[in-house]
Amino acid sequence: MAKKKIAISCGDIQGVGLELILKSHKEVSALCEPLYLTDGELLERANQLLHNAYETKVLNALAIDAPLPLLNSSTIGKVSAQSGAYSFESFKKACELADSKEVDGICTLPINKLAWQQAQIPFVGHTDFLKQRYKDHQIIMMLGCSKLFVGLFSDHVPLGAVSQLIQVGALVKFLLAFQKSTQAKIVQVCGFNPHAGEEGLFGEEDERILKAIQKSNQTLGFECFLGPLPADSAFAPNKRKITPFYVSMSHDVGLAPLKALYFDESINVSLNAPILRTSTDHGTAFDIAYQNKANNKSYLNAIKYLA
């Protein structure tokens, strides 16, 4: 069987993205046919910063229609509008290739959200762009690994805004889309308030979550969704034995336990999208960029998910 062709966007070049591309190419090319969306000149510069430890001529790289950012010992690890613009154009090109079926999927390396903002990119990050590009699809951010996957009902929104987002109709739509995308038989749903609201004692949000769970199970015809569970104990070992699939109302409630348990191996998956997209479950790691310290396990798992 022919290997799948995967477009890999470079992420912010001042971080660990190019380092991961170079150090992982041999393993990645054994899994798929990688197409690196970055100019060859930048790969050469990155290799020089890594003391020419890697072979760059064997990499299939596609030049990006954007000004080349500076990349040297004085720019690495720093936020740059030019690097932000370049990482966005790399990502956008990946989506275009996936839309036209020129690649089978895309893997995105980490971007810096402040760099995107400085470059006046009107999106918070990758997932926000996908939600705008594919408005007819309910794009769901799911992070994790085979041992634990967490779907986020809300992702990059202020915590104070989450309460108003928790409405029965919207949550039912989300839960059904999550189940359809994952084919999970059991999904544990975390509550929003302490003790999952204590039957209405602490806020009304958990009552709405319960109604959404009941309606979703009724639609499916079986008891798929369990909860709302008190979030402080939802990820205890005995709970994780029930199912690897969870839903969290907010970003940190779901991702704090995930990253405490499986930080190095977790990935980010965009569910319910018309294209296949995964990403590493870590940021640009500016503090260790170009020091040969970047762990590539998350990156390789993101590729394996697509391949």
Swiss-Prot record:
SUPFAM superfamilies associated with the record: Isocitrate/Isopropylmalate dehydrogenase-like
EC number: 1.1.1.262
Binding site for substrate: 126-127, 259, 268, 277
Positions annotated to bind a divalent metal cation: 156, 195, 251
Entry's localization field: Cytoplasm
Cofactors (names): Zn(2+); Mg(2+); Co(2+)
Statement: the UniProt record of this protein carries the keyword Zinc: yes
Keyword terms: Cobalt, Cytoplasm, Magnesium, Metal-binding, NAD, NADP, Oxidoreductase, Pyridoxine biosynthesis, Zinc
Membrane-spanning intervals of the chain: none
Coiled-coil ranges (or none): none
GO MF term set: 4-hydroxythreonine-4-phosphate dehydrogenase activity; cobalt ion binding; magnesium ion binding; NAD binding; zinc ion binding
Highest taxon in the source lineage: Bacteria
GO biological process, one term: pyridoxine biosynthetic process
Group of enzyme by EC: oxidoreductase
InterPro entries linked: PdxA_epsilonprot (IPR037539), PdxA_fam (IPR005255)
Biochemical pathway: Cofactor biosynthesis; pyridoxine 5'-phosphate biosynthesis; pyridoxine 5'-phosphate from D-erythrose 4-phosphate: step 4/5
A Gene Ontology term for the protein's cellular component: cytoplasm
Reactions catalysed according to its record: 4-(phosphooxy)-L-threonine + NAD(+) = 3-amino-2-oxopropyl phosphate + CO2 + NADH
Keyword Cell wall biogenesis/degradation carried by entry: no
NCBIfam families (UniProt xref): pdxA, PRK03946.1
Subunit structure: Homodimer.
The family this protein is said to belong to: Belongs to the PdxA family.
Extra remark beyond the main annotation: The active site is located at the dimer interface.
The name this protein goes by in its record: 4-hydroxythreonine-4-phosphate dehydrogenase
Annotated organism of origin: Helicobacter pylori (strain ATCC 700392 / 26695) (Campylobacter pylori)
